[in-house]
Curated annotation (Swiss-Prot):
Entry protein name: Integration host factor subunit beta
Family: Belongs to the bacterial histone-like protein family.
GO annotation (BP), single: DNA recombination
Gene expressing this chain: ihfB
PANTHER family, per database record: DNA-BINDING PROTEIN HU, INTEGRATION HOST FACTOR SUBUNIT BETA
Keywords assigned: DNA recombination, DNA-binding, Transcription, Transcription regulation, Translation regulation
Pfam families per UniProt: Bac_DNA_binding (PF00216)
HAMAP family linked to this entry: IHF_beta
Region (Disordered): 56-76
Entries under NCBIfam families matching the protein: hip, PRK00199.1
GO cellular component, one term: chromosome
SUPFAM superfamilies (UniProt xref): IHF-like DNA-binding proteins
Lineage, broadest ranks: Bacteria, Pseudomonadati, Pseudomonadota, Gammaproteobacteria, Alteromonadales
Amino acid sequence: MTKSELIEKLAMRQSQLSAKEVESAIKEMLEQMAQTLEGGDRIEIRGFGSFSLHFRAPRTGRNPKTGTSVELDGKYVPHFKPGKELRERVDAINV
């Protein structure tokens, strides 16, 4: 699902809100989440999951075009850990 599909679906379910209002709310929510992670804080949405930063240590990588070794700096990457309720709902999907 894309952001625009989410906005469309929420606008249909919440008839008292226009698509523009839903879009504004989604954009603001995502901006607040990004700012929280930028500040090094963790986000927890009970039942859904949590977002945090994990540090990826410096390492030696490889340039796929040339095959030469490249030193990569350490960096923080966003990490999502699903909550119990979300895990249970996904586990219940019959394949």
